[in-house]
C-alpha cells in the first residue's frame, strides 16, 4: 500500500502507527493533532472508497454551528455496487438498530467519513484500538447527547485489499 508515499508527495504530513488496528491509527493521529489544537477533525479512509471532494458537505454543518458531529452515511443509491460486503451491510443495520433502540439514535450507517469538533472529540475520551472505533464514537456522541447530523455521501470500491475480514473476529 503506497498511501503514505502518495500523501507525502501531495503535501500531507504523514504520521505512522506501527501497531495494527484502525483505532490505534486514529489515536496516534489525535496525539499528533493535540500539539496544534485544531477546530475540527475529519476522518476518512485513505483507500479511495470515500470521496474526499465531499469534505465540504461533512464539515459545513459544524462550521455553521448546527452540530458538533457530522457523519457521512453511505447511501445505497449513492454507493458503488459491491463497495460494501454483505457482512458490512448487515452489521451496520444491526448496530444502527441497537443504537436507536438503546439511545434513540438516528444513525443509518457507521461510515468512516466523519467530522467532529476537536473539543467534543476530547470529551469522548476515545479508547478503542481496533475496528470498534467508529461505533464507539457514535455511541459516546449519543450518551453525551451531543448534537449530530448524518449526510448522505457517495462511496466506491476500495483500492487494494481490506485489512478487516468482515467476520466477528475481525
Protein language model features and the residues they cover:
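Short beta-strand-to-loop acidic/aromatic patch adjacent to the donor-nucleotide binding site
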Residues: 37-49
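Short glycine/serine/threonine-enriched helix-capping/active-site loop
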Residues: 43, 70-73, 151-153
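Catalytic donor-sugar/metal-binding loop of nucleotide-sugar-dependent glycosyltransferases
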Residues: 105, 126-129, 139-156
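Short, high-confidence coil segments that cap the C-terminus of an alpha-helix
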Residues: 38-39, 66-67, 146
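Residue-level signature of catalytic and energy-coupling elements of molecular machines
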Residues: 29, 47, 117, 141, ...
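Hydrophobic residues within well-ordered alpha-helices
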Residues: 7, 62, 141-143
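Acceptor/aglycone-binding surface of glycosyltransferases and processive sugar-polymer synthases
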Residues: 16-20, 24-32, 52-131, 157-168
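Acidic helix N-cap motif at the loop->helix transition within catalytic regions
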Residues: 1-10
